[in-house]
Amino acid sequence: MKPYMARKLPFEKEIDYNRIAKKLIAASSSVSKLDGMLEEENISRELFINPLTKKEAVLSSQIEGTQATLTEILELEADEGKTDSKNKYDDFIEITNYNKAIEYAENEVLDKGKISLWLLRNIHKLLLNGARGKDKNPGEFRNEQNWIGKPGSTIENASFVPVPQENLTEYLENLENYINDFEEQSELIQAAIIHVQFEKIHPFKDGNGRIGRMLIPLFLYYKGILSRPILYISEYFEENRDEYYDKLNAVSESTEGWLEWIEFFLNAVETQANRNIEKFKKLQNLYGEYKGIISEILNTKNSIYVVDALFKIPVFKSTKLHEEISKSIDIDIGTVNRYIRKLVEAGVIVPEEGKDRYIKYYFKKLVDLIQ
């Protein structure tokens, strides 16, 4: 199979906005509502955003073949990454790296005011640090031809062969210019095009899918459409994985293929923006509910710090909960253990079964909500 020579951006022919108008309006409206919620002062990153960012990391990684669930990642965090399963440990590292990479990217875009090739390389370096792809030149664009196919496939029977390495620089520079120096009529349409173009270029030896999906909220954040790079779209892509790949693969010189991809993308954006709005509302309601419940159970002015800690680490060991609460107040481990016993007796948290020491505890209401 010959390498795919992607079209340079922007397109010479305009996109048929009449055809996609309804979907675009609906998706834009949902994103606007989501951003309005993100701008509220009571939407705390640590309490409400980080749990869903972890879920996005899990789902984006699952599209690439990881198996770990969000609950398993939370358990591994409580165990500080200790596990007898190499696969689980590798999944844990990949997902942890994803979280670090998106937070780093947000700060860099805010600081530098652009999405540069330098930034993409640094995101890639963070993503692959100590992970399965650590031998795939983390932080470096590929210097040889790659291809996509089933395990063991060759370039001759590959399902897709990206841009040749000798053309990589010109395509990446074209993409960088399109991201930073060009404005489509709609930023959502531009995000859809950027995602496809990045995947068609496939500039890294590994990690292209995750970075390509990360680029979607990052671009909307850069353009000011989102006040934070929060548009957890991987859930929709994972649920519709076959269609996601079919639509990506169908994009070529054909205008129809592009339009079908854009329609699919706008459906994903609208669906996930609405889901995220509902999820944030449920998280806020749960937080308000348990502020009252835990205050009544513990009967102490420290209860608010306990609630905050449970939202930050919904699966924990007593020492970790003590460490988290101690970031806000001076408190001894004995007092924290007393709080834990009361919360277990009240059914607010559930202890790990079958262990007498170093027990993990689960704030099940929150775990179930974000899972």
Predicted feature residues:
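FIC/Doc superfamily catalytic core
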Residues: 1-371
